[in-house]
Amino acid sequence: MITQKMKYALKALLELADEARRDSPQALTIEEIATRSGTPKRFLEHILLDLRKAGVVASIRGRSGGYSLLKAPRDVSISELVRRIDGPIAPLPCLSRSAYQPCDDCHDEAACRIRKVFAEVFWSYLVLIDSLTLEDMLAAGNPAAKLLED
């Protein structure tokens, strides 16, 4: 499950991506992003800072400053964003790619039935989420539908 913070990050990125598609895109202020996305302004400052550190958005200072999308939507991986904003996405620490830890109460990972069941579910989830980009989210309809058709 993604956190509310992640949902706010995605809403902000979708607004920035929509703005980038315009004929004359402008940097958006935090206030504009908050209004357009329905996201509380107080959360956006921290979220946009995280996204800037991740190299996804740029911040422009000054009178006509604000935020703009730095990467093309097709280059913004949803799974990387989730990991950046929410942390590891694995259901068990022993399945995590980025934060692997053996389970404290497990003596034999290879024989662990809990791990085996959750590994199958998790790998299916990874196939889907690792293939999704911000561009998929911008597309009309269900972004997962095109993956299921292939």
Curated annotation (Swiss-Prot):
Keywords: DNA-binding. Pfam families: Rrf2. GO terms for cellular component: cytosol. One of its GO terms (molecular function) is DNA-binding transcription factor activity. InterPro entries: TR_Rrf2-type_CS, Tscrpt_reg_Rrf2, WH-like_DNA-bd_sf, WH_DNA-bd_sf. SUPFAM superfamilies: Winged helix' DNA-binding domain. Gene3D superfamilies: Winged helix-like DNA-binding domain superfamily/Winged helix DNA-binding domain. Residues 1-139 form the HTH rrf2-type domain. It comes from the Bacteria. PANTHER family: HTH-TYPE TRANSCRIPTIONAL REGULATOR ISCR, WINGED HELIX-TURN-HELIX TRANSCRIPTIONAL REGULATOR, RRF2 FAMILY. This is Putative HTH-type transcriptional regulator rrf2-like.
